[in-house]
């Protein structure tokens, strides 16, 4: 069963294309994480937040990634990381065209 991880944290930029250029190495690293199916990068310049929505193959992979990524972000000086893990209801999600 896949698991969804929702992460957000305070972020002061850069945004958009500048963020993409600055974070491309990190994105390549995340793409290699065990159990990761996909990640959607999120950003809100209006609220000064960034984060992502991740789909993992299983709960242990999501939990391990959240623990590692929280430490990594804190190492970058991020004061607070919010993370939640949810089981995915495959049947209902497929009805609504989820990319599972």
Language-model regions, residue ranges each:
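A common structural junction motif
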Residues: 30, 70-77
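A short, exposed loop/beta-hairpin motif centered on an aromatic-Gly-Thr core
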Residues: 51-55
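Conserved short beta-strand edge segments in small beta-sheet-based binding/regulatory domains
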Residues: 75-87
